[in-house]
Regions:
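Membrane-interface helix caps and helix-loop-helix hairpins in membrane proteins
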Residues: 95, 159-161, 186-192, 216-222, ...
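Intrinsic disorder in cytosolic terminal tails and internal cytosolic loops
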Residues: 1-6, 188, 448-470
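Transmembrane-helix bundle of Major Facilitator Superfamily
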Residues: 1-180, 316-317, 323-324, 328-330, ...
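Interfacial helix-cap and linker-helix signal at transmembrane-aqueous boundaries
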Residues: 34-35, 65-66, 150-158, 213, ...
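Membrane-interface "helix-start" segments
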Residues: 190-202
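12-transmembrane solute porter fold
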Residues: 9-29, 45-50, 138, 197, ...
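C-terminal membrane-cytosol helix-exit motif in multi-pass small-molecule transporters
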Residues: 168-187, 203-215, 233-248, 441-449
Length: 470
């Protein structure tokens, strides 16, 4: 019965993560109809940015809350908030309302990937856990790629509102699965005291930072008042946050985690890999269509081997970690991603679909060798009481790196275009920037402790506060 309930939990986690991942991209093909229906063209980009902002900012918060209050109740709370945001987004009567409801949706979505990965980390042993997290990474990638297609189909054959309503029946199934199959063991000790001051300072600081990054990407400069102002606010808020966290009995982000070499190396490597990865996903299709003259369909096809490589190597990376340790695996992954960007920087107008597919596959293999091994190594290193916070921080830094990387690469492209260079030359500058970032990530990967399979296996023998049961 326990195995059956464990499978139900995994199904509920995968289903909810699929919905959250798809929602990050599903609106892209629906937005022309949304603008025609609601107006607000001048602020429509915040339909995307608002979701990204709240989902990113809340990742560490959700992770820590799950450590303090229990995985089940916090995960269900986040899932319900996500579904409420979905329902209200479908009912929106103005662009301003839609943006607000999308931010509510993102608030819930921030919990789903972070706590979902944490639940998997507690339910399974090392090798099985890595395989399951590989599957979840695959679910995320497939859902993100399917989003625009699903959005287009729903918009054409039903209504743009159904890109939000579609979450409700499937989300209800996920709620039922998690609610009935997952049980939190009682937390011993006194009632936890929530770090409200740290929560406010962290939210304000990271929100201001992301607003500055998003604005810099939009205007292609980092010197405007609309960028510098939020950056100053972010610096002040985060400085206060560091002071508050050092004194808080139950900090929302336990700074002591960064004294652990594995956590620090994984956070920095994930941040840099995220900068490069999100840039590739965003600018590769643009190059293929605008410079090489491929169709939108062909450009989309090129991203498929990227996802397949990521999924395949995520699943098999556990065996590699068990045999040779995680530093070698992570370094090999970053070298593959570096090779992919080196090949991207050599693209030309005569690029063939086969070569583009090859390079995307190499990049996907690199990400698969990097992300899941770092996550399972961190989960096997930290105390069980910090598992949610540590898992969330790794994913937070990867997402934050992606947002900053997109902005930097967008600025590079705009600055090169302003010099009169062709779009192809401008995009070459973007890929060279990604190559430099990858080289820095390789150096960061060497900071990952060598590790041995025996060490991971011993670290995996911990008490288990999350279980399956009736």
């Amino acid at each position: 019965m326990a195995d059956r309930r464990r499978r139900l939990v995994v199904l509920g986690v995968m289903l909810s993560i699929f919905l959250a991942a798809m929602e990050s991209t599903v609106v892209s093909t629906a937005m022309p109809r949304v603008v025609a229906s609601l107006g607000g063209l001048e602020i429509y980009s915040w339909v995307f940015s608002g979701f990204l902002l709240t989902s990113t900012v809340t990742m560490p918060i959700w992770g820590r809350l799950s450590d303090l209050l229990g995985r089940r109740r916090v995960y269900l709370g986040g899932l319900v908030i996500f579904l409420l945001g979905s329902a209200l987004s479908g009912l929106a009567q103005s662009m301003t309302q839609l943006i607000g409801f999308r931010m509510l949706q993102g608030l819930g979505a921030g919990s789903l990937m972070t706590i979902g990965m944490t639940i998997i980390g507690e339910l399974f042993g090392l090798e099985k856990r890595a395989k399951m997290q590989g599957y979840i990474s695959g679910v995320w990638g497939v859902a993100s790629l399917c989003g625009p297609l699903v959005g287009g189909l729903l918009t054409d054959h039903a209504s743009w509102r159904w890109v939000f309503y579609i979450n409700l029946p499937f989300g209800a199934v996920a709620v039922a699965l998690i609610a009935t199959a997952l049980v939190d063991s009682p937390r011993a000790g006194r009632r936890p005291v929530l770090d409200y001051a740290g929560l406010v300072c962290f939210t304000a600081g990271i929100s201001a930072l992301l607003i500055a990054v998003l604005e810099a990407g939009r205007v292609a400069t980092w010197t405007g008042l609309d960028v510098v102002g939020p950056l100053v606010l972010a610096a002040v808020a985060l400085a206060v946050f560091l002071v508050v966290e050092r004194r808080a009995p139950e900090p929302i982000v336990p700074l002591r985690l960064f004294a652990i070499r594995m956590v620090l190396a994984a956070a920095s490597t994930g941040f840099l890999a995220g900068m490069a990865m999100f840039g590739a996903i965003s600018f590769v299709p643009l190059y293929l269509q605008s410079v090489s003259g491929m169709s939108a369909t062909a450009a989309g096809v090129v991203l498929i081997p990227f996802v397949l490589g990521w999924v395949a190597m995520s699943i098999t990376s556990a065996r590699l970690v068990l045999r040779i340790g995680y530093r070698i695996v992570v370094v090999a992954g970053m070298l593959c991603l570096t090779l992919a960007f080196l090949l991207l920087s050599r693209w030309s107008e005569s690029l063939t679909l086969g070569l583009a597919t090859r390079d995307a596959l190499i990049g996907g293999v690199g990400m698969g060798l990097t992300m899941v091994p770092m996550l399972i190594a961190v989960q096997s290193t930290v105390a069980r009481s910090d598992l949610g916070a540590a898992t969330a921080m790794i994913q937070f830094f990867r997402t934050l790196g992606g947002a900053i990387g997109l902005s930097i690469m967008g600025t590079v492209m705009a600055s090169r275009l302003s010099l009169g260079l062709s779009q192809g030359d401008a995009l070459h500058g973007v890929f060279v920037t990604g190559l430099v970032i990858c080289l820095a990530a390789v150096a960061s990967a060497f900071l990952v402790p060598a590790g041995r399979a025996q060490d991971l296996a011993r670290a995996d023998l911990r008490s288990e506060p999350t279980r399956v049961g009736g």
